Amino acid sequence: MATSATAAATAPAVTAAPVKVPQGATVSTREGEMPSWQIPNVAEAAEAYYGPDSEHLIAQVKSPLAAKSARGLSGFLTKTFTDSGTEEVLINDRGWDGCSYFFPDGKRLVWTSIRDNMNMPMGNWSDWRNYPQGAELYVSDRAGKNVKRLTNNQQYEAEVTVSPDGKWIVFGRMTNGNMDLWVMNSDGTGERQLTFTDDDQEGAPYFLPDNETILFRAWKASEYDQKPTPMTIYTIKRDGSDRKPRTFTHDMNWAPYPTPDGEHFLFVRAETPRNWEVYLGYLDGTTPPKRITFDEGFDGFPAVSPDGRKMVWTSSRSAGPGAGFMSGLQLHVMDVTALGLGPKK
């Protein structure tokens, strides 16, 4: 097992059998990284998150059924599948989908789509100034049935996740060109705004295991044209109090995700404008972050399985020669058992 020297130096010693590698997958043991592999049989995809069984994933996957971009390229729709690349299920069959997440019961899903607002401008999921204003939030079962629309206001709503106890949904909403965090009950009632900042643009919220603390990232509208855009990762309480920075460098700290032990978080940092890497951060506020990926290109959207043993992330490392920086993105899994990120007993 190849293990990052820097990560292993600070992580607790963990003795466990290696994570099972899917049949047909090729294990990568590149220098500095723990063993990883590309998920087979899944099309280009981004932002995958584990379900409670630490095996099934939900993600937006490129699909010919999705709406086309302004350049005529196929969009993305929500699917679930295993991290072995089996049991693929199409959850939504029209429009263009964004972020999605499992409820902790493993029976329900929450996802973002423009499916009911196709008469509105498509916008651009990657451009804050042009987010799709028709993006709404939905809940369904694991078969994509029993769909319930949670929002109905023709504003951009996305970046949606669920608390570990299943009682709360947190998401990002754009109002009058400004992004803020909102929380509501898991049935869609009781919407409440958490952040009220003019310059800071908050998003990517995730609950920590305590169901009270929310990890998120923010950038300043006044700095958006700097590339890579400076971003800071914060925590805030569910009632909107106790906002604290968790990264302390004025560069791009992006795509945070809390680990099941409640002590760490994954995030992405831009080493150069075209080399983004995954890091392990520490919520103690004093321990320097440790680099997890080592590849020239795009490594982003990291998430940890609930058992703490696997990290899924999106990478361009499998793209062919001449591919663009964020082109040909595929999902990969890394065996991070050695980091000891599982739930505290």
Where are these regions (language model features)?
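Right-handed parallel beta-helix/beta-solenoid
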Residues: 166, 198-203, 211
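Blade-level signature of beta-propeller repeat domains, shared across WD40, Kelch, NHL, RCC1
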Residues: 303-345
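Residue-level detector of Asp-centered blade-edge/turn motifs that repeat once per structural unit
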Residues: 52-53, 104-105, 164-165, 209-210, ...
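A flexible loop/linker signature enriched in serine peptidases of the S9 family
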Residues: 41-42, 60-77, 91-97, 112-136, ...
